[in-house]
A protein has these predicted regions:
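Eukaryotic phosphotyrosine signaling hubs
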Residues: 6, 88-91
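Glycine-centered loop/turn motif at secondary-structure junctions
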Residues: 27-28, 72, 108
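Short, composition-biased local secondary-structure segments
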Residues: 13, 73-74
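Active-site-proximal cofactor/substrate-binding loop regions of enzyme domains
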Residues: 1-57, 65
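Long, hydrophobic/aromatic-enriched structural stretches that serve as scaffold segments
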Residues: 60-61, 66-71
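Vicinal oxygen chelate
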Residues: 35, 43-48, 53-61, 76-79, ...
Length: 186
């Protein structure tokens, strides 16, 4: 897809604590507090993995009311919930665009564009109305950050870098350089 670039990886977990512990066990570094997404009833933790790149650990926020729509990234899907009972997983990736409307003209699946905000961050994100990952996980989610602020710029640099990543048939593999060596998350 033209006009997009990698933005972040998505790790889903039943709880943020489980997700953070999983990332720590895989990469040897821990994500830091992110924030809440009231529209989706989720919250997250974030890990810097390079310039304008981050890894997001996301989970349903037990303190949030149920959203008036299905949550993103399949988090309401019974199959995803069963999968996460066995532990957190790298489930998706998000690509950034500077022109959401142009990117969506090339995008092979209809999505609803949500305008969201948290603190000084503002973004538009394309989410299928059913909350599932686009293309059953074979297409990236599209995001457009409004203004010049990007969450990765505020994250501590732990020395973890995404070296390469591949998505094929809904499966993701990411290779990282970390302070303790090269690590791969399948």
């Amino acid at each position: 897809m033209s006009g997009t670039t990698f933005d972040h990886l998505v790790v889903a977990a039943r709880t943020l604590d489980e997700g953070a512990a999983w990332v720590m066990s895989k990469l040897g570094v821990a994500p830091v507090a992110g924030g809440k997404h009231p529209t989706m009833g989720t919250h997250n933790r974030l890990l810097f993995i390079g310039q304008r790149r981050f890894l997001e650990v996301i989970a349903i926020d037990p303190d949030a009311p149920a959203p008036g729509r299905p949550r993103w990234f399949d988090l309401d899907d019974p199959g995803m919930r069963t999968k996460l009972e066995h532990g957190p997983a790298l489930i998706h990736w998000v690509e950034r665009t500077d022109d959401m409307d142009a990117a969506l003209r090339e995008y092979p699946q209809p999505v609803e564009v949500l305008a969201l905000a948290r603190g000084s961050y503002r973004w538009r994100i394309g989410v299928p109305k059913d909350g599932r990952r686009p293309g059953g996980g074979t297409l990236p989610t599209l995001i457009q950050w409004e203004g010049s602020l990007h969450p990765a710029e505020a994250l501590p640099d732990t020395g973890c870098r995404l070296e390469r990543f591949a998505a094929k048939e809904g499966r993701i593999e990411a290779v990282f350089s970390t302070p303790s060596g090269t690590r791969t998350i399948p």
